[in-house]
Curated annotation (Swiss-Prot):
PANTHER family in the cross-refs: 3-ISOPROPYLMALATE DEHYDROGENASE (PTHR42979:SF1)
Organism: Pelagibacter ubique (strain HTCC1062)
Chain positions recorded as substrate binding sites: R100, R110, R138, D229
Protein's GO biological process: L-leucine biosynthetic process
Pfam families: Iso_dh
Keyword Manganese tagged: yes
NCBIfam families: leuB
Main subcellular location: cytoplasm
EC number: 1.1.1.85
Pathway, per record: Amino-acid biosynthesis; L-leucine biosynthesis; L-leucine from 3-methyl-2-oxobutanoate: step 3/4
Function noted in UniProt: Catalyzes the oxidation of 3-carboxy-2-hydroxy-4-methylpentanoate (3-isopropylmalate) to 3-carboxy-4-methyl-2-oxopentanoate. The product decarboxylates to 4-methyl-2 oxopentanoate.
Protein name per its UniProtKB record: 3-isopropylmalate dehydrogenase
Record-linked InterPro entries: IsoCit/isopropylmalate_DH_CS, IsoPropMal-DH-like_dom, Isopropylmalate_DH
């Protein structure tokens, strides 16, 4: 293989089990450097509660600038009960929100794939989820999480009022819809756009702009519109009707979590947050497992690293266009599951329980 240019990767292990699962990603990166003539330069730093403990802030300016200079960021997990009582601006999760906003990561990709080896782990019947492969594309930097005005203010009679603003512009909708349509062209060529156009003006605009974009540039892709509450119901009733779902920040947050539980384990599911491409065709991006920091099992060597490793596979695919390497890594995960190896969260009768590091080593062994 031809040696490619040096690529800077910033690892932010974060809190709880984050350092343990990111360590397994680091092992994969070093293996690729040694065996596939890839040239990744790894930097590692603090974000989340661990950063607050050391620096008094969930992410320092220095770390943020490192993120700006990196090809992409690999995040472990942030947060935990230890920091629940901090003021809002100091909470570990603010590091994640700042990275998303300032790196302009507008599209969150959340695959919900049911591994055949684990189909019995789903709460739904096997025939409902077997073969499930959904990609949820969530708009990430607009909507009610970032809209202004916002806040809590006193009003008359000693009451208080909480305010959040839900708004979207044409450009915010169109750019994330383009991501969804482009992904669909590489999958089963179907997009379902979800909103609440029956009661929300922002939802009406969303539906109109997605339809107009489709009619202008993506007529070859099958497009349907669905109210978000109906989508939540359909994900339980008939999830395999979906290919790519595109939706706003709030509904995407909820629907992607719901879809993830169809698969049986959060420990298997990756995510990607993508930004716009510059004139050289490069884009900023951040990759992370969808599971939380799980402080109750931190340090016990029982965390599942598969979601983090598959997140790195997404980085190979979407940030570096290394599809063959991404395919090989995803196949290695499948092969290990076929061998019956399981971390504690996905362990079932007749399978062999392995530690976090042993699972990482087994996956690397399949890359040989």
């Amino acid at each position: 293989m031809i040696k490619i240019k040096k690529r800077k990767i910033l690892l932010l292990p974060g809190d709880g089990i984050g350092p343990e699962v990111i360590q397994e990603v680091k092992k994969v990166i070093l293996w690729l450097n040694s065996n596939k003539s890839l040239d990744f330069e790894i930097d590692e730093d603090l974000a989340g509660g661990c950063s607050y403990d050391k620096h008094g802030t969930p992410i320092t300016d220095e770390v943020f600038y490192k993120a700006l200079e990196s090809e992409f960021v690999m995040l472990g997990a942030v947060g935990g009960p230890k920091w629940d009582n901090l003021e809002f601006s100091k909470k570990p999760e603010r590091a994640l929100l700042k990275l998303r906003k300032e790196l302009k990561l507008f599209a969150n990709l959340r695959p919900a794939i049911c591994f055949e080896q684990l189909v019995d782990a789903s709460t739904l019947k096997p025939e409902i989820v077997s073969g499930l492969d959904i990609m949820i594309v969530r708009e990430l930097t607009g909507g009610i999480y970032f809209g202004e005005p916002r806040g809590i203010k006193p009003i008359e009679n000693g009451e208080r009022k909480g305010i959040n603003t839900h708004s979207y512009t044409t450009s915010e909708i169109v750019r994330v819809a383009k991501v969804a349509f482009d992904l669909a062209r590489k999958r089963s060529n179907r997009v379902t756009s979800c909103e609440k156009s029956n009661v929300m003006e922002a939802g009406q605009l969303w539906k109109e702009e997605v339809q107009e974009l489709h009619d202008k540039e993506y007529k070859d892709v099958e497009l349907s519109h669905m109210l978000a509450d109906n989508c939540a119901m359909q994900l339980l009733k008939n999830p395999k009707q979906f290919d790519v779902i595109v939706t706003d920040n709030l509904f995407g947050d909820m629907l992607s979590d719901q879809a993830s539980m169809l698969t049986g384990s959060l420990g298997l599911l990756p995510s990607a947050s993508l930004g716009a491409k510059n004139k050289d065709g490069e884009m900023r991006a951040m990759y992370e497992p969808i599971h939380g920091s799980a402080p109750d099992i931190a340090g016990k060597e029982i965390a599942n690293p598969i979601a983090s490793i598959l997140s790195f596979a997404m980085a190979l695919r979407y940030s570096l266009d290394l599809d063959s390497e991404a395919d090989a890594l995803e196949k290695a995960v499948q092969d290990v599951l076929n061998d019956g190896l399981r971390t504690k969260d996905i362990l079932s009768q007749g399978k062999k329980e392995v530690s976090t590091s042993a699972m990482g080593d087994a996956i690397i062994s399949k890359l040989q």
